[in-house]
């Protein structure tokens, strides 16, 4: 996701997106460990998206 897309989310939408991204990251890690993941850069991209959403959520909590 692009940072502008994440900033446009409401607090509830951002929390839901965080749950979805964490589940996706778990699945990617599992597939990587079993040798089924071809595009390993998806791990890094998903991890960075999680960090972006967490940053936006912390801004809502201030």
From Swiss-Prot:
Family annotation (HAMAP family): Ribosomal_uL29
GO biological process terms held by the UniProt record: translation
Keyword Ribosomal protein set for record: yes
Keywords assigned by UniProt, alphabetized: Ribonucleoprotein, Ribosomal protein
Gene3D superfamilies to which the protein is assigned, alphabetical: 1.10.287.310
Keyword Ribonucleoprotein found: yes
Name listed for the protein in its UniProt record: Large ribosomal subunit protein uL29
InterPro entries per UniProt: Ribosomal_protein_uL29, Ribosomal_uL29, Ribosomal_uL29_sf
PANTHER family: 60S RIBOSOMAL PROTEIN L35/50S RIBOSOMAL PROTEIN L29, LARGE RIBOSOMAL SUBUNIT PROTEIN UL29C
Family from the record: Belongs to the universal ribosomal protein uL29 family.
GO MF entries: structural constituent of ribosome
Cited Pfam families: Ribosomal_L29 (PF00831)
GO cellular component, one term: cytosolic large ribosomal subunit
